Amino acid sequence: MSLSASDIARIASLARLQLASDESERMLSQINGFFDLVERMRSVDTAGVEPLAHPVAAVEDITLRLRDDVASEPDNREANQKSAPAVEAGLFLVPKVIE
């Protein structure tokens, strides 16, 4: 896949960006370079390759050292909700904005 200068102009327009011609050319080069890299990665035969959770796991046996899931701060819900204009059953009440 490769983009053209008109594709870059359209994307910039959709993003509400104004790109100078040199910026547009640079973006075209960078994005097409990215797409080339993706195509090269897609072409690699990965049949039989086991997915890795961590890249170092391919060369050595690692055990992830995860910390215990413990609350590090006290529950200050009531104190935090004192300044709220409306609270119900421990939840902040906000105006409906989507019909």
From Swiss-Prot:
GO terms for biological process: glutaminyl-tRNAGln biosynthesis via transamidation; regulation of translational fidelity; translation. It catalyses: L-glutamyl-tRNA(Gln) + L-glutamine + ATP + H2O = L-glutaminyl-tRNA(Gln) + L-glutamate + ADP + phosphate + H(+); L-aspartyl-tRNA(Asn) + L-glutamine + ATP + H2O = L-asparaginyl-tRNA(Asn) + L-glutamate + ADP + phosphate + 2 H(+). The keyword Ligase applies. Pfam families: GatC. InterPro entries: Asp/Glu-ADT_sf_sub_c (IPR036113), GatC (IPR003837). GO terms for molecular function: asparaginyl-tRNA synthase (glutamine-hydrolyzing) activity; ATP binding; glutaminyl-tRNA synthase (glutamine-hydrolyzing) activity. Its EC number is 6.3.5.-. Keywords: ATP-binding, Ligase, Nucleotide-binding, Protein biosynthesis. PANTHER family: GLUTAMYL-TRNA(GLN) AMIDOTRANSFERASE SUBUNIT C, MITOCHONDRIAL (PTHR15004:SF0). Allows the formation of correctly charged Asn-tRNA(Asn) or Gln-tRNA(Gln) through the transamidation of misacylated Asp-tRNA(Asn) or Glu-tRNA(Gln) in organisms which lack either or both of asparaginyl-tRNA or glutaminyl-tRNA synthetases. The reaction takes place in the presence of glutamine and ATP through an activated phospho-Asp-tRNA(Asn) or phospho-Glu-tRNA(Gln). Belongs to the GatC family. Heterotrimer of A, B and C subunits. This is Aspartyl/glutamyl-tRNA(Asn/Gln) amidotransferase subunit C. It comes from Variovorax paradoxus (strain S110). The gene is gatC.
